[in-house]
Regions:
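Conserved lysine of the Walker
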Residues: 2
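Switch/coupling sub-region of P-loop NTPases
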Residues: 8-136
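Conserved P-loop NTPase
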Residues: 136-194
Length: 194
């Protein structure tokens, strides 16, 4: 669901606009789509062999790809899936390029506000407080995809947009302020502003 939504959002980017994707594994495959010749698709590389300074030989992470991407005069940057160390790379991209998108695992759009800073702090890139400030300043929307599994009663598995939160740019009690702009209730959709 997350990757499908991200692909749909990418499809809205004009074909002549230069943008890049950074992924641990090629999942978006935007660079293979017809009419997408003005794209920089970079993939991380898993190292092997013995480790040097805590890294495997030949390892090239998403964070390592950021400087190369920033040299390419991109209008947007898509960081595939943010699981751990990619969080710092995503934050670096957000501060350098005006249009960024990414996906991550979280229980709700609201819980993403706490998950991202803790992932960034684990990588030692920013403190949690600095990460909260970066979220408030650089993120605009948080979209949550939910799996609805009705196979137990003969139905099917559906993924729906269950919540959309706007990040206002403000901070209260050291956390970014968000407002619900959309929420699905019991599989039904509704506009539900805070």
């Amino acid at each position: 669901g997350k990757t499908t939504l991200l692909r749909a959002l990418i499809a809205a980017i004009p074909a002549n606009e230069r943008f890049g994707t950074l992924e641990t594994d090629y999942e978006l495959l935007v660079h293979l789509q017809p009419g997408r010749s003005n794209i920089l698709a970079l993939q991380a590389r898993v190292g092997m062999g013995e480790t040097q300074d805590g890294r495997r030989l030949g390892e090239y992470t998403v964070a390592d790809l950021i400087p190369e991407a920033l040299r390419q005069n991109l209008s947007r940057l898509v960081v595939g899936e943010v699981r751990g160390g990619e969080a710092g790379a995503m934050f670096e991209a957000m501060t350098a390029i005006t249009g960024t998108m990414s996906t991550t695992h979280s229980h709700s759009a609201a819980s993403t506000i706490d998950r991202l800073p803790s992932r960034v702090a684990q990588g030692g890139v920013l403190s949690i407080e600095e990460a909260y400030r970066q979220i408030a300043h650089h993120l605009h929307l948080l979209v949550h995809i939910q799996l609805i599994d009705n196979t137990w009663r003969g139905g099917r598995r559906d993924r729906i947009v269950s919540e959309v939160r706007q990040v206002t740019g403000g901070i209260e009690s050291s956390r970014p302020v968000t407002h619900v702009v959309y929420r699905a209730e019991d599989g039904r959709t509704s506009y539900a502003p805070d």
